[in-house]
């Protein structure tokens, strides 16, 4: 597997391409980060974009991350995933307002820009009239995506307490280990299929879920995020070697992935 050692001053960024696969890779700095992206075999064969998104940016002791799963039944779900993923990565690196109310307000404010950009994605001219009408109806209802985003600020010898902040809507997986014991139960009942973000209305199905806690110095932790294309990981609690995760991404047992898959794992 590809390994990236710590870059100058601990800077590292990865943003997935929805038009290509990215085999499982590892970055090692203050965090150990494993990341990957794969399209469903159907999308790959037809040359279509994937509808998932994963992005991570590290700068020394801090890490910002986003994972999105575009809603296929909405109009251009890949657009919502890409737009929201990039927008949240920027926001995480600049905001000083971490309250639930501030985040919910931000998620509503960005719909104007998203809707304006979505209007530029007109259905291709060669599609049949009936299909064009269906696509235009979908376009008026907006593009939607599920998401998980967050920021980690590591504790240090001088600053003994760090923190992790996360927000999400939807049923993508969010799993958390503290000192090798999984403590993900808090998140399970809030990972709801009917919740997502829309370019038209912002949060759908309720307000975003926001979680924040302190991080203790010297306590090993692991955070794992993935979309439902990798649901084979659901029952697995132990730390898997790279080769086994890549097998799940290659999915030889089903002739390729049945759904798009984005994967991000952080250890510190």
How should each PLM-predicted stretch be described?
Residues 1-8, 125-135, 199-268:
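C-terminal catalytic subdomain
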Residues 2-92, 172, 205-208, 212-213:
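N-terminal entry segment of metal-dependent catalytic domains or homologous docking segments
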Residues 42-47, 137-140, 253-254:
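Short Gly/Pro-enriched turn/cap motifs at secondary-structure boundaries
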Residues 47-58, 139-165, 187-227, 231-235:
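Acidic loop->beta-strand submotif enriched in PP2C/PPM serine/threonine phosphatases
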Residues 65-69, 167-169, 224-226:
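Short hydrophobic beta-strand that contains or immediately precedes a catalytic carboxylate
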Residues 86-126, 235-259:
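Helix-loop-helix
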Residues 101-178, 206-217:
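Catalytic core of PPM/PP2C metal-dependent serine/threonine phosphatase domains
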Residues 176-185, 189:
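A short, surface-exposed interaction/processing loop segment used at functional sites
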């Amino acid at each position: 597997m590809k390994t990236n050692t710590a870059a100058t001053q601990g800077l590292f960024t990865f943003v997935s391409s929805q038009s290509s696969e990215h085999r499982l890779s590892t970055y090692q700095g203050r965090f150990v980060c494993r990341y990957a992206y794969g399209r469903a075999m159907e999308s790959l064969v037809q040359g279509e974009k994937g509808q998932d998104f994963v992005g991570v940016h590290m700068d020394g002791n801090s890490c910002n991350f986003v994972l999105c799963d575009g809603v296929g039944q909405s109009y251009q779900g890949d657009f919502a995933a890409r737009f929201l993923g990039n927008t949240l990565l920027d926001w995480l690196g600049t905001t000083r307002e971490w309250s639930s109310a501030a985040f919910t307000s931000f998620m509503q404010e960005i719909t104007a820009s998203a809707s304006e950009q979505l209007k530029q994605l007109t259905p291709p001219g060669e599609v049949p009239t009936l299909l064009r009408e269906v696509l235009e109806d979908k376009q008026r209802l907006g593009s939607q995506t599920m998401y998980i985003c967050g920021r980690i600020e590591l504790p240090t010898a001088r600053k003994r307490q760090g923190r992790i902040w996360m927000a999400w809507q939807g049923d993508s997986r969010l799993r958390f280990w503290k000192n090798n014991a999984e403590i993900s139960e808090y998140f399970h009942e809030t990972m709801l299929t009917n919740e997502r973000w829309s370019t038209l209305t912002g949060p759908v199905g309720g307000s975003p879920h926001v979680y924040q806690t302190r991080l203790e110095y010297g306590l090993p932790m692991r955070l794992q995020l993935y979309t439902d294309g990798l649901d084979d990981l659901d029952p697995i609690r132990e730390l898997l070697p790279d080769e086994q995760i890549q097998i799940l991404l290659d999915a030889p047992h089903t002739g390729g992935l049945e759904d798009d898959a984005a994967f991000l794992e952080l250890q510190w």
